[in-house]
Amino acid sequence: IQKTRTQLNDAINQALLVVEPSMSQVEKAMVLHDYLISTTAYTSNAGNAFRLTEVGVFLKHKANCEGYSRAYAILMQKVGIPVKFVSSNKMVHMWNEIKIGQKWYHVDVTWDDPMDARDKTDQYGRVSHQNFLCSAARMRKTKHYDFSTADATSTKYDNRYWKSINTVSYTHLRAHETRH
């Protein structure tokens, strides 16, 4: 267990290397969002017990929504951004809310990790931002339902240019260099 804990801490610290001191809260939240997506593939495989945990994300590089959410929460805490979990029982889904300035916003790292529509495989290195820094109203428009939150009412980031970008991320390049 101690070896896994050490490996996990090392992997978390590796992820944090993409954060630069001069970055704003939004930039930190985005670069860590992109890092997780660039280094993790979605899995719903029930045989993969780690899929529900940060170990699945940081050490196995495979996780489901709970694993992505737990990993993102750890990274947000490490960079001083308040974070909490949001879930929908009917969707059987989990994601985060983070606080930027004095406002809360939804972030669904899982749904921003693009999958090939034909064979449902991860599109390695591709990142979406449709579910990054969203109001509750926008989340409902992106097919999230059966969740309650009174906090995420600000629409400040709902129509930002990055919502329509689905591309190779900056962190993909760094992650690729680290792996090879």
Residue spans for each PLM region:
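Secondary-structure boundary elements
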Residues: Q2-V57
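Alpha-helix capping and helix-loop boundary segments enriched in small/acidic/polar residues
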Residues: K3, L59-A63, S87
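Hydrophobic/aromatic-rich core segments of domains that either
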Residues: G67-M139
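Non-catalytic ligand/cofactor/substrate-binding and regulatory segments of enzyme domains
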Residues: I1-N9, N131-L133, H144
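Extracellular adhesion/carbohydrate-binding repeat motifs centered on closely spaced tryptophans
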Residues: S88-K90, E97, T155-K156, R160-Y170
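Conserved small/polar residues in nucleotide/adenosyl-binding loops
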Residues: T171-H180
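Catalytic cores of secreted or luminal carbohydrate-active enzymes
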Residues: A150
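Flexible, surface-exposed loop/gating regions in the mature catalytic domains
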Residues: T43-A71, L75-K78, W95
